């Protein structure tokens, strides 16, 4: 019998962004925020918050697209999130990482670097696909060219596969799951404040949604429930403990 707590859900697109924005606003002080892996836009509404936003991305084309489209970064850094020196230690109040970890071979190393970049008690906002869902299982086995075709013709994203645009190659380390994140937090003294599963990908009456829902239910049944069909992605708000850096011996 599973000991995992019941998963709260995000049933409408952008509902988790509203939740996360509210949590960050409640911090009630000037903030240093890092977007670790830059998307093409910034989904959080932090109106009224005094904050400085830094963006880090290994893909210079993606970073340049963000700068040209939004112009909202106070600082832009080209760097590898899994490299220890990329993120300054204990600098940020909030680190936002959205659908990036699945693209990094050393996902745990990158996550440790992010936690090290947080001030004690800082918040990590993490959005990942669940490798133990039907969606994640399928993505892990789909050839990359087919993944691009899916985005271009099924999701109807015309820029799919172009430089700086999704989808990007994926690795789906074991960490990229409910069990993986909970184990990581338990080992590293972190507290999970929010854990939400995204369900809106199988909600609605559109033909594409109905096809997706039928496929997800069927594969979940074949797996005897080992693969979840009700959610595809996960959102976490994680609080760093009050201890020092992770993954290194204390510096005297």
Predicted features, each with a name:
Residues 94-105:
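A short SAM/SAH-binding and catalytic strip from SAM-dependent methyltransferases
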Residues 83, 102, 133:
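Active-site micro-motifs of SAM-dependent methyltransferase domains
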Residues 108-109, 113, 123-244:
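S-adenosyl-L-methionine-dependent methyltransferase catalytic module, highlighting the catalytic core
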Residues 104-105, 118-120:
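Helix-to-beta-strand junctions that scaffold the AdoMet/dcAdoMet cofactor pocket
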Residues 23-25, 112-116:
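Short amphipathic alpha-helices and their capping/turn segments at secondary-structure boundaries
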Residues 1-90, 94-96, 197, 231-235, ...:
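Conserved N-terminal segment of class I S-adenosyl-L-methionine
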Residues 33, 55, 100, 125-128:
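Generic enzyme active-site microenvironment
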């Amino acid at each position: 019998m599973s000991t995992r707590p019941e998963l709260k859900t995000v049933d409408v697109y952008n509902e988790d962004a509203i939740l996360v924005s509210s949590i960050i606003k409640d911090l009630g002080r000037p903030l240093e925020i890092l977007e670790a892996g830059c998307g093409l836009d910034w989904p959080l509404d932090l109106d009224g918050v005094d904050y400085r936003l830094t963006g880090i991305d290994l893909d210079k084309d993606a970073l340049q697209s963000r700068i040209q489209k939004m112009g909202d970064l106070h600082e832009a850094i080209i760097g590898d999130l899994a490299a220890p020196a990329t993120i300054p230690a204990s600098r940020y109040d909030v680190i936002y990482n959205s659908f990036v970890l699945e693209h990094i071979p050393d996902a745990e190393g990158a996550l440790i670097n992010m936690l090290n970049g947080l001030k004690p008690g800082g918040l990590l906002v993490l959005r990942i696909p669940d490798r133990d869902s039907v969606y994640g299982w399928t993505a892990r086995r789909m050839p990359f060219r087919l993944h691009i075709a899916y985005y271009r013709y099924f999701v109807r994203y015309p820029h799919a596969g172009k430089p700086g645009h999704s989808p990007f190659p994926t690795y789906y380390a074991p960490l990229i799951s409910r069990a993986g994140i909970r184990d990581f937090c338990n080992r590293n003294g972190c507290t999970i404040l929010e854990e939400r599963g995204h369900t809106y990908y199988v909600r609605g009456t559109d033909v594409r949604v109905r096809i997706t829902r039928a496929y997800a239910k069927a594969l979940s049944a074949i797996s005897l429930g080992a693969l979840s069909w009700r959610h595809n992605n996960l959102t976490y708000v994680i609080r760093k403990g009050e201890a020092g850096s992770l993954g290194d011996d204390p510096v005297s």
